[in-house]
């Protein structure tokens, strides 16, 4: 194990441990300090004793309460190394409310712009709904970081010049990755503004010029100040937004907006709303009122959460007592060193976790590494991969962690911009995740077509121990490096009752599921697809499709033959893939490409037989008997495929399996087995430039599933999908048919060569399966998209 040097001596560590015995009592390991840190037990005891001892009432009634509030205001300024001559302290509900206050009251003038960092908390994006700027721009993190290197980026500015005002908002520390934007950028922005062309305009009109604009900085410091010192004598943002529960753990419901003297000048002189305590007077009979002269009093609407504010005093005292200044290193500096040391230790250990085949277990999300504390905080974000490379969903990690008492965070952490940046999500992928797939913030839909929609985050506080980090590492080692996927999923299912409600729902989706059914009514033509969200009517209903003795109802029941009675396949005519079937209203309708015109056939075999002649052909050297479907469809096929003498034949009698497959199996016009199953994880490993759906289509499978590991289906012997049992007949040996793009008919040879490389020269992809004969087979059985796949 890599070395780790503790920041705290033995006595200090013992005192800290004594304050958090509830963790051991509840068998919990807490690793989400970026969400909130934990309160010390003596802290809340002292706060409760004060409430029992003192009379603390409405500050408008009781001067003592007002004095307490003023003490807290002074402690806040002292905590950030500033004084009331330089900054005002406005108490708010939280950092989000502080950001909202800035958005509502900042005076942009006519030409002012709103700029914000992509890697920001959702609340910063919410500011866009309230700011009255001419235009809004999204900045990359490096565009803001670049302002720190300007020669003028020194101690900021004290005032402003005539002109309009632009506002730049960014986080001091990214709550997703822990990356710290250099605070020297504050002065660079204030003095130099932003160069023309920086950022992506997302709203409004581009101003004619911003040369005369004053630039102000709003610093979202909620994540940063929880474990780092913020020196407002050295760095002077115009607005600082914080939440105290992230620093002390208790109380919740109180934050603050710190406003510099310069920042106060850029606030509007008139508010859109005022509450009690913010005015000198207000007439009910006329539109006349006057705001308070004291700046912070103008914006603290209504009665302050005075009990919570008074409780902050014990938070300051507890933090200073448990992590005292030592050798001229202040409390928050020591906490910063402690959490960074833990993050650095964890990052090194995670990089060493590998599967026996050498595949790394962990994908880390970080900008600059963990060597420099001034650039990286006590946060580690990552995802887990399988031994074949695909990602494991963060919801599964959350389940595994919860069952072992490890509390961590998963998702995007209310920072969709950071998710977009670190996960490499372009605009098309964002739409696929949030609009088409329907993911919402806070859910556990963690993988969409193998692409992670979020990550796992662990973060540290002053009470986090190295042993806690080691328990996380142990969990990852035992659950992923030393346990097979099926064993892990079984364990989660067995203990799912112990999970929180949201994770119980995610645990139910850990097993592989039936994602899609593909029915190929006409052999070698396109598929009629049944998938999550709806099918196509006809025999199927929504996501469900019936089974027959031969397989999926109507699958490969028709085939096209030439004038010699020989089956026409894509090997001879690749344009067959452009014949697209639709099953509805007791009709099979065939279309060519995107043409709305088509030709219809009855689904009823009895109706077909009345007006059809019998004919014979062969499938895989086996004779088949069928019914000729008539001249109309024959002419339509010849016209669209450019081949004369084509006929459409419908199977009229059953055929049995041969060529190594069990003799009792009844077949349609398929080549070898009743069903062909393909695993999207295996398809994903091919990594073609085309969309995953296009590649899946190449393999012309009936049953499409998605599992945790690529090619694991090749080891299956039997499986159950929903209530239907299947026997694996063997792997599908591929030919050059899979080189045909099923949406265009174009050929590309790399499909075969890639499979050959991945399978050590073998052309295997997908597996043949057949339904096992049981008593249930005597009744109509169905497959439904969403059915759980259980390997037995």
Swiss-Prot record:
Signal peptide limits: none
Gene name of this polypeptide: mal
Keyword Acetylation included in the entry's annotation: no
Function: Sulfurates the molybdenum cofactor. Sulfation of molybdenum is essential for xanthine dehydrogenase (XDH) and aldehyde oxidase (ADO) enzymes in which molybdenum cofactor is liganded by 1 oxygen and 1 sulfur atom in active form.
Alphabetical list of InterPro entries matching this protein: Aminotrans_V_dom (IPR000192), MoCF_Sase_C (IPR005302), MoCo_sulfurase (IPR028886), MOCOS_middle (IPR005303), PyrdxlP-dep_Trfase (IPR015424), PyrdxlP-dep_Trfase_major (IPR015421), PyrdxlP-dep_Trfase_small (IPR015422), Pyrv_Knase-like_insert_dom_sf (IPR011037)
PANTHER family: MITOCHONDRIAL AMIDOXIME REDUCING COMPONENT 1, MOLYBDOPTERIN COFACTOR SULFURASE MOSC
Family, similarity comment: Belongs to the class-V pyridoxal-phosphate-dependent aminotransferase family. MOCOS subfamily.
Active site (record annotation): 414
GO biological process: Mo-molybdopterin cofactor biosynthetic process; molybdopterin cofactor metabolic process
MF terms (GO), sorted A to Z: lyase activity; molybdenum cofactor sulfurtransferase activity; molybdenum ion binding; pyridoxal phosphate binding
Assigned EC number: 2.8.1.9
Modification type N6-(pyridoxal phosphate)lysine: residues: 246
Disulfide bonds: none
Reaction equations catalysed: Mo-molybdopterin + L-cysteine + AH2 = thio-Mo-molybdopterin + L-alanine + A + H2O
Protein name: Molybdenum cofactor sulfurase
Keyword vocabulary terms for this entry: Molybdenum cofactor biosynthesis, Phosphoprotein, Pyridoxal phosphate, Transferase
PTM annotation (Phosphoserine): residues: 748
Pathway the protein contributes to: Cofactor biosynthesis; molybdopterin biosynthesis
Taxonomy, superkingdom: Eukaryota
Domain MOSC: 646-792
Cofactor list: pyridoxal 5'-phosphate
